[in-house]
Amino acid sequence: METFVASGLRLEDTELARFLTAHGYPCLDALHACAAAQPERFWREVEQALGLRWATPYQRVCDLARGPAWPRWFAGGELDLHDNLVGRIACEDPQRPALLWEGDDGSVRVHDYAALDDEVRRLATGLAGLGVRSGDRVAMYLPMVPEAAVVLLACARLGAIGLPLFSGYGADAVASRLQDSGAKLLVCADGYLRRGRQVDMLGEARRAAERAPALEAMVVVARLGGGRWPEHGAAHWRETAYRDLVERSAPRQGAAPHAADAPLMILYTSGTTGRPKGVVHTHAGFPLKAAQDMMMAFDVKPRDRIGWITDMGWMMGPWLVFGGLLRGATLMLFEGTPDHPRPDRLWQLAGRHRLTHLGLSPTLARLLMAEGEAGLPAPGALDALRVFGSTGEPWNEAPWRWLFERVGEGRRPIINYSGGTEIGGGILACFAGLPQKPCGFAGPIPGMVADVVDGAGQRLRTPAAGESDGGNGADAGVGELVLRAPWPGMAAGFWQDEARYVDAYWSRFPGLWVHGDWARIDADGHWFIEGRSDDTLKIAGKRVGPAEYESALVGHPLVKEAVAIGVPDPVKGETAVCFVTLAARGAAAATAEGWAASERALRAHVAERLGKPLAPARVHCTAALPRTRNGKILRRLVRAAYLGQALGDLTSLEDPAALDAIRACAEPAGAVA
């Protein structure tokens, strides 16, 4: 596979190169070796490079008395996160922009570091006045508005545990998380704008609050009301306007140190069954991991401007806040959708705010690519942009090349980034200034002692240079992605459920974190994620990732998007069934009469690329694919809907009607949605 090096960024000019030079490492491989062999030295150097200020120095970098599943990082140390993230820059460079916000309607707000410092201190005072104490859980049900960042930071200052929730959740999802966490207070918005329409949040929040007996207060951000929210008595909680609370509270000065391993935040991530998992992160670990990844992989420097299309209820929202502010950067928060009111809205946003870093999903790139010329930026719109970021799902080659070549003009690297909520950041990444392959990763982020193992937990052999990797065969290095050592950003367990955490990640192979992804390493040392290990198909004994099918289909001119699942087959054991949405030129093929010929053509197209034994049994045409609001296609739900199985947790689903289209495909006689 062809290797690319973005022309606009040299390795020697990056923060990674500066770190290597400052600490005497001749190359990145030497840094990886040190991180594996001397983790205490490595992580001490990282925290010092990030400039962490300790109120009480730590006694030990990592205490493993309870084993690798339960490390205590920076044991004995205390730090004031507010001082590290906001306070020191508010003193040294008060007018540096900290938060930029653009609403769906184009309205803009700016907080410099001094204003952010003042508002965080005021809100912390106000929350304390409402009874919030260290260790209490404070939930936030907010769109991407500046107040979302302020709430996270105010909780950190108080030692309260922040609980960011996805803004698209309904009352049931919010209630289950309030109940599980025992949240004392909820900060919510009255609503937000999406594609020019008002979306209610306060009604959903109140319905959820009725089922959360531990909740004592609700603070309401008037995003839509445009004025002050009147205090409102309710069944067992009281309501207060956010703006009133901030304005009547003093910006209390002084330090606010907390233990390095004190809980900072609970991030909920959905499981396929059972209740959502509350992933606990700590005061030192999560900000350090986020900022380290920004420094080493993304080349984020102080005063850079970072935007990421995400939600505060997903890991990348808090990652942006804690990592970006620790790097002294300016954060861009965007309320709207990146293709409204025009397909080039995202590029306009990046240009208007002079973003240096922009994060987006592969799905968004595919959608914009399908718009043709209308999905491209205007000349000069991205002049300030140095780096693209991407996470959340695997790439297909065609949209990757479109983003790199057509949008990025070959000058801007795409930092592919794979990790997860439980990781607190990334396991694998590309690195600014280093070669990259479409859809792949240059390797593990330093400190992540990653490996690929077989079903017995044994390391898989990587093909030698010049040796064929055999495509994607089981003996060519495709196996489970594991981690052989702990790291500061790792989950400090699941909220009040230690056994479930150990079972999820540490129970399969002794001493190894099993992440649940299939991965492979090619002969050049580049890494590739082949999908979730529970998504992988095994057809007549041949293991193949769904991304293989999806990449082949998206490469056909009829297809806009694709998803592949495995279904039971009496002969092969399992066979592939695919679902596609159509590009503009394929719309005429969507009729029942025209689709039969198009389906045959697409099956042949896949067979030509993957081999006849791996040809999909069916390729269905559907109007939409089930996805989250941040663009991730939900294969689990596609498979469950198609097979008529229980759907499980639907809280992250954007459009439930998409599941009806999938169910229709399963009807007799090959009905087409």
Descriptions of predicted regions:
Residues 217-222, 608-633, 645-672:
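AMP-binding/adenylate-forming catalytic domain of the ANL superfamily
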Residues 306, 326-329, 355-360, 369-438, ...:
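Gly/Ser/Thr-rich phosphate-binding loop
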Residues 140, 165-191, 205, 351, ...:
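AMP-binding/adenylate-forming catalytic core of the ANL superfamily
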Residues 444-445, 458-505, 544, 647:
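Conserved ATP/PPi-binding loop(s) of AMP-dependent carboxylate-activating enzymes
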